[in-house]
A protein has these predicted regions:
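Membrane-interface loops
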Residues: 45, 49-59, 63, 88-180
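N-terminal transmembrane-helix/juxtamembrane module of multi-pass inner/ER membrane proteins
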Residues: 1-84, 126-127, 131-137
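Hydrophobic alpha-helical membrane-associated segments
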Residues: 39, 43, 115, 192-193, ...
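Hydrophobic alpha-helical transmembrane segments
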Residues: 19-23, 36-37, 84-87, 94-100, 106-111, 176-183, 193-194, ...
């Protein structure tokens, strides 16, 4: 029974087709590269500004579109992509996997999340894009703007968490729903950053693309490492 449970949590168990994963990685890198190039050359400035201003009262840029409860909801939803919640949920998930002695899934989750967070920080230092100055910020910020860490790490985290969780679910339709739900949560988080005035839309687009690409790359790495381990085990058995 325990072996069956471990197989369900193996990152390589029922993985998406490799061609699909490679296509997603390539597409994500392309979207990020094009977005970064456009940002560097100022080609996104007009659209970024138009979207930000469209979400604010024309007569008072400090007032976001919608009633007060909607503004409060956006502030609470954006916290789902903040490090306090992500680190807490990650720690609890890793603890559960450790208690199950499923080190492969735990390592997959830990490396994927920590690597994605590190990549986001490095890119922020490299681009050093200023935060939006058109509207009042409705959330505190401490780093530069491009790419959005909330969008990137949120996308990576919830997709990776869903990838681990679906190992328990036998029905394909339910697995698809869980992955789609994770994707939707990440979209809401990124959108809330623009609504709150703390990110340009192009920051969020770049973050989303990197999050999807990094999650897919982690799946590919898990597959190839698992296959190499299987080849070594098979070679060892053939020699005995």
């Amino acid at each position: 029974m325990r072996d069956g449970l471990r197989s369900r949590l193996d990152p390589n168990h029922n993985h998406p087709p490799l061609a699909v994963l490679w296509s997603i990685v390539a597409g994500s890198v392309l979207v990020f590269a094009l977005t970064a190039f456009a940002v560097r050359n100022g080609w996104t400035d007009s659209l970024d500004r138009s979207i930000l201003l469209a979400l604010r009262d024309a007569s008072d840029p400090s007032d976001a579109w919608g009633p007060a409860w909607f503004e409060e909801t956006a502030a609470e939803l954006t916290a789902l992509g903040g490090y306090p919640i992500l680190v807490t949920v990650s720690a609890l998930t890793l603890a559960v996997l450790a208690l199950m002695r499923n080190w492969a899934a735990a390592l997959f989750l830990a490396i994927g999340l920590s690597g994605g967070a590190a990549l986001s920080s490095v890119l922020k230092l490299g681009f050093e894009r200023a935060r939006p100055d058109l509207v009042d910020h409705m959330d505190r910020t401490f780093t530069s703007s491009f790419p959005s860490a909330h969008a990137m790490v949120g996308m990576l985290f919830y997709l990776t968490l869903a990838a681990v969780a679906v190992r328990f679910v036998p029905r394909h339709s339910v697995r698809v729903f869980m992955v789609c739900a994770a994707f939707a949560i990440a979209i809401v988080i990124g959108s809330s950053r623009v609504y709150l005035g703390v990110h340009w839309p192009s920051d969020v687009l770049a973050g989303w693309s990197l999050g999807v690409g990094w999650a897919s790359l982690c799946w590919l790495a898990a597959h190839y490492l698992s296959r190499r381990r299987g080849d070594r085990d098979a070679l060892g058995h053939s020699r005995t």
